[in-house]
Amino acid sequence: MADGDSGSERGGGGGGGGGPGGFQPAPRGGGGGGGGPGGEQETQELASKRLDIQNKRFYLDVKQNAKGRFLKIAEVGAGGSKSRLTLSMAVAAEFRDSLGDFIEHYAQLGPSSPEQLAAGAEEGGGPRRALKSEFLVRENRKYYLDLKENQRGRFLRIRQTVNRGGGGFGGGPGPGGLQSGQTIALPAQGLIEFRDALAKLIDDYGGDEDELAGGPGGGAGGPGGGLYGELPEGTSITVDSKRFFFDVGCNKYGVFLRVSEVKPSYRNAITVPFKAWGKFGGAFCRYADEMKEIQERQRDKLYERRGGGSGGGDESEGEEVDED
């Protein structure tokens, strides 16, 4: 996908006379919406949201099939051509958090200098190096997020690649779910609007994904309902320039904790299965206690070097006076 018109030459889709249509719950009957031949197997569209950003149209559709609940993001370009991304609801939540980081970074950027714009013109109007980049990896999919700039403005380019393997939530086309990379370009001015719309869909339709991921019997009425029907809420902490996100989720393998480390320049994450939480917690507590003892010993040695012994002599003299 070429970069033009704030990121894409395909961004000329009609601005939609009706404007943003708000959230539209869709009929829950079975029906299309899935990509490829497998997409018609009882895929339900639960909600749809349209956004008109500059001269582009974006659609966010929450869908559900036998593999779980997922989100499709479509950018409609000139002539009705579309670029689509498919995200599980868990990845959509990570994507929402990443958008928050890009929004903060974009807000801190100053206007482009004439020299920078001239350099972009000499390069044919193509995007310069990324102003900020992150990537997400989940199962057989990778998502690359790059905040870029060309003569038309700044934009967030989001590219999805799918490795060969089992088909994903959307039932991707091709043998074994193989699918060429898809890219959308979101004008930077619409980042907040896009993030807020995504967050609303996640709040409204992401809560049951844990039950869906558990498969048959994992719902509230099944034997696993107590485990998959309710999970702890996610949280985050900030340390210096880093942010750590703690998100509890579940899939067919069980409950897990995803710990994401986010800095302005990169994002990394680990997944800890539920059965290892106690060991991880014990290890953290043990190291915290050991470091506390080490710090206390170091403080004691420092006091001694600064003449702590003289204080002891004063106490001795004081005791002798009292005895007299």
Swiss-Prot record:
Entry's induction text: By fasting or glucagon.
Residues that bear Phosphoserine: 6, 8, 113, 310, 316
Role summary: Transcriptional regulator which can act as an activator or a repressor. Represses the transcription of ACTA2 in fibroblasts and smooth muscle cells via its ability to interact with the purine-rich strand of a MCAT-containing element in the 5' flanking region of the gene. Represses the transcription of MYOCD, capable of repressing all isoforms of MYOCD but the magnitude of the repressive effects is most notable for the SMC-specific isoforms.
Pfam families: PurA
Residues found modified as N6-acetyllysine: 279
UniProt GO BP: negative regulation of DNA-templated transcription; negative regulation of transcription by RNA polymerase II; positive regulation of transcription by RNA polymerase II
InterPro entries: PUR-bd_fam
Residues with PTM Phosphothreonine: 43
Listed Basic and acidic residues bias regions: 297-307
DNA-binding: region residues: 37-263
Name of the protein: Transcriptional regulator protein Pur-beta
Record annotation: effect of changing residue 297 to Q: Reduced transcriptional repression of MYOCD
Primary localization class, coarse: nucleus
Residues modified as Omega-N-methylarginine: 28, 164, 306
Organism: Mus musculus
